[in-house]
């Protein structure tokens, strides 16, 4: 787009913009989207960063909008516990949480219930209820060969999640006609067009 307007920009400049501004946009997006009451779908995806496997914990609501993401080096109960606690702090308690049959997610959920969080929440592990989030992982698995460090992978994924979230929200509301990423970012940042 910039080249079409006569502006010559190196690809490393665009990469630096993504690394710097994607975090800001992600946190603004999270501030504006703080409601999810009915059901959450949670899963983890494997992402290779510099030849080593890392784990991307993701949670979406019943409409498919991303609630939160968290990139971790380990896939264990402690990481799942911290992610569930973080979700509870931001969104409160849903009616149901749908996960796969991963032992770490189940034990973390039981541990949080014993502490007093999620007392009324139902934990479902039915295989086909989690299809929505499994399909939602695709873009991150496709781009895994480009990630060179945990920090850059995290900020790149946050930027991708923000743009996908804006697109999904407009698609769900039926306002995709005339959709513009730049207009949505201006609205997100409170800048008048």
Question: Where on the chain are the PLM-derived regions?
Answer:
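Residue-level recognition of single "structural anchor" positions
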Residues: 1-193
């Amino acid at each position: 787009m910039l080249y079409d307007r006569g502006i010559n920009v190196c690809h490393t400049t665009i990469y630096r913009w993504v690394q710097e501004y994607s975090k800001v946009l992600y946190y603004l997006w999270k501030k504006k989207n703080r409601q999810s009451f009915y059901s959450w779908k949670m899963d983890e995806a494997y992402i290779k960063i510099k030849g080593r496997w890392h784990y991307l914990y993701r949670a979406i609501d019943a409409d498919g909008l991303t609630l939160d993401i968290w990139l971790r080096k380990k896939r264990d109960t402690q990481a799942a516990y911290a992610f569930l606690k973080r979700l509870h702090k931001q969104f409160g308690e849903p009616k149901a949480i749908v996960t796969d049959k991963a032992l770490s997610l189940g034990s973390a959920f039981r541990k949080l219930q014993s502490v007093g969080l999620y007392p009324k929440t139902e934990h479902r592990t039915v295989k086909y209820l989690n299809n929505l989030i499994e399909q939602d992982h695709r873009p991150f698995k496709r781009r895994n060969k480009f990630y060179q460090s945990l920090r850059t992978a995290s900020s790149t994924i946050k930027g991708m999640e923000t743009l996908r979230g804006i697109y999904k929200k407009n698609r769900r509301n039926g306002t995709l006609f005339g959709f513009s990423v730049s207009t949505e970012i201006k609205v997100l940042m409170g800048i008048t067009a």
